[in-house]
UniProtKB/Swiss-Prot annotation:
Task performed by this protein: Usually encoded in the trnK tRNA gene intron. Probably assists in splicing its own and other chloroplast group II introns.
Name of this chain's protein: Maturase K
Family statement: Belongs to the intron maturase 2 family. MatK subfamily.
HAMAP family per the UniProt record, alphabetical: MatK (MF_01390)
UniProt-listed InterPro entries: Domain_X, Maturase_MatK, Maturase_MatK_N
A Pfam match: MatK_N
GO cellular component: chloroplast
Example GO biological process: tRNA processing
Record key words, sorted: Chloroplast, mRNA processing, Plastid, RNA-binding, tRNA processing
Organism in which the protein naturally occurs: Adiantum capillus-veneris
Locations listed in the record: Plastid, Chloroplast
GO molecular function: RNA binding
Length: 500
């Protein structure tokens, strides 16, 4: 890696160091760039290693941190003009709480963002093929779920011990002083204490929680996603004969067979059925396996030990957070109840002498809509009560009739597009019935009339718009798990404040 030194003013706002670019416009901390010499000093220790910089990536000097904190607190510098600006004032609200902790927190956020994200980008780009083929959640559900026998469902732990984060960063940041600084900041801010790892509006700009959360999830993805190919190469040959060994061990007492362990005794056809499939959505991940129950239990134990000792997990709850081993018939995910239904096909086999008809069995991905999801979602938005009885939307009474009907039609379009993958269309018909009754109740409450008088008019108008919206629905003969469609629908769900 080429090492460049010089004045930051001469190099311009875009500083180039090998393949790593620093653009000051991308950072949210203008106070830290008042002393550019101190900023580039934070990168000096890493660059001083020369060609071995990648081996110790992220080794930073805390001398620059102290200088930056001192420059911010320097009374001789006039920071009042900077505080008067609206943008900087919004970023420095924390100064009212702690004049020392706030610049310390901003500097910690800056170093973590620079030290961790380029490494994440480099690792993900080198393994992009594996990430694209396995980590796509919808392809995982379509292609892998129906072929699996057991599903491991787990949530990322919400409460971590603070030392767990320190141990994670210790592998990337070799500066012991900075790690002690992180410990102080984490304990002061109580990072991850009682917080979920994904909240749409939880993270604020400039918060140290954002790089910590992203790096933590990236570490779990790297541990669970990347090594499976290497596990198959180096470990599956040792894991595959486990079931065979148990069977043969029982046969030893019934016969004089003597089992000999060698490479030729490995059944590679048996090894091919031991694939592990991994998928994650927000803070919940699924691991599907095609192996036997014994192999899955062994892999579950191996995974638990791996995560426990790799991340040094210390959770408030004594219950293991990764212990749900489910069959492919009762998995709740993305607002669906995921099923792998058995299907049979008649196959005609023609031979020289005769024609035979045989039955070929298989599994098909069969997502269903649970009643609890519909009732809970509609009750949250005040379209029905928690027993499923439709009620009027009182917040929409002040709107015009057209806006009320348009609101219900838009809600139906979102539901029908998202739940179009369901095989039980009866639940969709029940959903439109609930929305129709709620629409009638809303219009009746607005005009202070009975539902019966308005039903004819509202039914005609709403049904015409619903029929017109059918062109947006995907055909049942095609795959409906489209990431672009689901992404657009999730945006609508976020706007409507409907959680999945």
């Amino acid at each position: 890696m080429k090492v460049n030194y010089g004045s930051p003013a001469k190099s311009g706002p875009l500083h180039k160091n090998g393949e790593f670019y620093i653009n000051k416009n991308c950072f949210l901390h203008p106070l830290l760039f008042l002393s550019e010499e101190n900023f580039y000093l934070t990168d000096g220790k890493r660059r001083s290693h020369g060609a071995d910089a990648n081996l110790v990536f992220g080794a930073w000097s805390t001398v620059a941190v102290k200088r930056l904190i001192g420059s911010v607190r320097d009374p001789n510098l006039n920071f009042l003009k900077i505080y008067d600006s609206v943008s900087v004032r919004n970023l420095t609200d924390g100064l009212d709480v702690d004049l020392y902790l706030h610049p310390l927190l901003k500097m910690t956020y800056l170093i973590l963002g620079i030290a961790l994200f380029p490494k994440i980008r480099a690792e993900t780009s080198s393994k992009s093929k594996m990430l694209q083929s396995i980590h796509s959640m919808f392809l995982f559900l379509e292609d892998r779920f129906s072929k699996s026998n057991h599903i491991l469902e787990a949530d990322l732990p919400h409460n971590l011990h603070l030392e767990t984060l320190i141990r994670l960063f210790r592998r990337q940041i070799k500066d012991v002083s900075f790690l002690h600084l992180l410990r102080i900041v984490f304990r002061k801010r109580k990072i991850f204490c009682g917080k979920t790892f994904y909240s749409p509006g939880g993270g604020q700009d400039g918060s140290v929680d954002i790089p910590v959360r992203n790096f933590y999830i990236f570490e779990i993805d790297s541990l669970l996603l990347i090594p499976w190919k290497q596990v198959y190469k180096f470990r599956v040959n040792y894991l595959s004969p486990i079931d065979s060994c148990n069977i043969i061990r029982k046969e030893i007492y019934a016969s004089a067979y003597k089992f000999k362990w060698n490479k030729a005794s490995i059944d590679y056809s048996f090894s091919r059925s031991l694939w592990i499939h991994y998928g994650r959505w927000r803070n919940k991940f699924l691991i599907a396996s095609e192996g036997t129950h014994y192999f899955v239990k062994k892999m579950l134990y191996y995974l638990w030990i791996l995560l426990k000792y790799h991340f040094h997990y210390r959770i408030k709850s004594n219950e293991p957070w990764i212990r749900k081993l489910l069959p492919t018939s009762c998995v709740s995910f993305l607002g669906y109840t995921l099923l792998a239904q058995l299907v049979s096909k008649n196959v005609r086999i023609e031979t020289v002498t005769d024609l035979y008809i045989s039955i070929l069995g298989g599994k098909k991905f069969y997502p269903k809509i649970p009643n609890s999801i519909i009732i809970t979602t509609l009750a949250k938005q005040r379209f029905c009560d928690f027993t499923g009885r439709p009620i009027g939307k009182s917040a929409w009474v002040t709107s015009t009739d057209d806006k009320i009907i348009d609101g219900y039609v838009q809600l139906w379009q979102v539901f029908s597009l998202y739940y179009g993958a369901s095989m039980n269309q009866y639940r969709l018909r029940r959903l439109i019935f609930l929305l129709q009754m709620s629409c009638d109740s809303t219009l009746a409450g607005k005009h202070r009339s009975t539902i019966r008088l308005l039903r004819c008019k509202s039914n005609v108008e709403a049904l015409n718009q619903i029929l017109a919206s059918r062109k947006f629905e995907l055909s049942s003969s095609r795959r409906v798990w489209r990431s672009s469609s689901i992404r657009s629908v999730l945006v609508q769900f976020t706007v409507l404040d409907i959680g999945l």
